[in-house]
Structures are given as C-alpha cells and as structure tokens.
Swiss-Prot record:
This is Protein-export protein SecB. Homotetramer, a dimer of dimers. One homotetramer interacts with 1 SecA dimer. One of the proteins required for the normal export of preproteins out of the cell cytoplasm. It is a molecular chaperone that binds to a subset of precursor proteins, maintaining them in a translocation-competent state. It also specifically binds to its receptor SecA. SUPFAM superfamilies: SecB-like. GO terms for cellular component: cytoplasm. The keyword Cytoplasm applies. GO terms for biological process: protein folding; protein tetramerization; protein transport. It comes from Paramagnetospirillum magneticum (strain ATCC 700264 / AMB-1) (Magnetospirillum magneticum). Transmembrane segments: none annotated. Belongs to the SecB family.
Amino acid sequence: MTDAQTPSEDLPQLQVNMQYIKDLSFEIPGAPHSFIEMQGKNPEIPIHVDVNVGNVGANAYEVVLHLKIEALLDGKALFILELAYAGVFTLNLPEEQIHPVLLIECPRLLFPFARNIVADMTRDGGLPPLLLQPLDFVELYRARAAEMNAQQGQA
C-alpha cells in the first residue's frame, strides 16, 4: 500500500501568479473650485463594481476587478476614479468550481489592494482618503447569475 499522491494533488488549488494595475484614471473636473464646494458637505459616492475573467493559458486566468467611483454633489461630479485592478491566477480545481472561484474568491483576494489604491489616489488628489467598505462578491456573483438567467429566459 502507498499513500503517494499524484502530482496534481500536490499542486495548490489556487495560486496567485501576479497582480497589477491594468488601468487607472483619476480626475477632479472642477478643481480648485470643487474643493471649496465640498467643504462641510457629504457628497453622494456611488460605486460601480464589475469583474471580468479571461483565459491566459492552461488553467491560468486573468481576473480584472473594475471599480468606478464618482463623487457627486448636487448632481455635479466632484471626482471620478476608475480602476481596473487585475491578477493572474492558476487554478487546479474541478471544472464545476472554477467559475465561482474566479468570480468570488479571486476578486476577494484582489479587493484589499484595489481598496488601498483608491484610498491613496483620493488622498494624493487632495481629498480625504476614500475607504471602501468590504464588498460581498458572493452577492455580486448571485446577482450576475440571476441577470444572466433572466436574459436567457427572455431570449
């Protein structure tokens, strides 16, 4: 009897190969006047989140976390920040687990780094650092799946 594992069992199930800023844009359209307008006010700050996945090789995937943040005061943009933060992941998982891991676990691993970039960019732009609250990628995954099912139902 042997307890030897096959080589595929020895591999990590999820490996982070690299992380990087794929695209970053930050603007304060009304500067310097917008700094004065903002004082003592709380702008509305909607955050749009999306996750895209692409295959880059054998069991290797690029996961891109997209954040679009726009601070609005009386309908006017105070600042606009767009970030595409990406990572390349190698997965050694059963086929049925790959999609949820790519859209839930991988963005969850990328988020703290993207959150830090957002805080640094807003601070370096002369604003108070914007500290994003944790995101529920499971809920985002479910909402996306429901949306896709609804679209397929209409087709």
